Amino acid sequence: MGAPKQRWTSEEEAALRAGVARHGVGNWRMILNDPELSSTLRYRSNVDLKDKWRNMNVIVTSSSTRDRGRTSTRRTRAAPKNNDQLLAMSTITSEVDDEIVDVKPIVSMSVEGWNTSNSKKSHSRLDNIIMEAIKNLNEPTGSHRTTIANYIEEQYWPPSDFDHLLSAKLKYLATSGKLLKVNRKYRIAPSLLEDVQREPLKLGSDASRTLTRSQVDAELVRMATMTVEAAAAAAAHAVAEAEAIMAEAEAAAREAEAAEAEARAAQAFAEAAVLTLKNRNAAKLV
């Protein structure tokens, strides 16, 4: 286990804000290498900066009564104006920094539209994202799971259990014949490759859309100028979306496990059939 992460200091938060103002959202490595900021942020990584910036700009309300009570108290305060608005947002989010839920949605969707049929569509979109990664990587011998994961993480905001979800999806796609797995590398099946090249992947629909990192960063900047009430409402919606993504991940894992069980049963049946045939041939020879 690594060393426990230290709580962010006010100097580090100020340095992060200055770095974002100077280099822009998403340029975490440039911020860490900035001569004026590197000494203050020397104990922080790219991921630390990304997560902290997201937490500083999104207020997430938990389901406990205590948190709801605290949120209600904040909402009774007069809404700040102009520049005081951003300062109030930063102060409040700093107070609840340790209680903020790590929300990293890979797909944004309306909660009302989340049902069984939409769950199947979401699975299809995740399949397409994996297909897109393998197609764009275009490696002759196929792409390793780590390479696929890195590509998706660069293009989208994956959920916290992304590794488990990706492994389950790759196993399911390989079992169903959509992907070929050779030496731990994945390639698109030849029968599907022509369809993928002929028809562009459609990752969105009327009920949902896939957000890239740049779009998410732009959304966070927009949320920084919201009132406390509007930001709290948006954060609550983000929590609901994250819960929907978790439900999707669990369903995908169950689907992959079911497919694996079917494959094992089919293999056992085939082995039993071969053994029966051998026994019959042996009996005839006797």
From Swiss-Prot:
Q: What is the first-listed, main subcellular location in coarse terms?
A: nucleus
Q: Domain named HTH myb-type: which ranges? A: 1-61
Q: Which residues bind DNA?
A: 28-57
Q: Which residues form a coiled coil?
A: 229-277
Q: What UniProt keywords apply to this chain's record, in alphabetical order? A: Chromosome, Coiled coil, DNA-binding, Nucleus, Telomere, Transcription, Transcription regulation
GO annotations of cellular component type: chromatin; chromosome, telomeric region; nucleolus; nucleosome; nucleus
Family annotation (PROSITE patterns): H15, HTH_MYB
How does it associate, per the subunit comment?
Forms a homodimer and heterodimers.
Function summary: Binds preferentially double-stranded telomeric repeats, but may also bind to the single telomeric strand.
Name by which UniProt lists this protein: Single myb histone 5
Organism field: Zea mays (Maize)
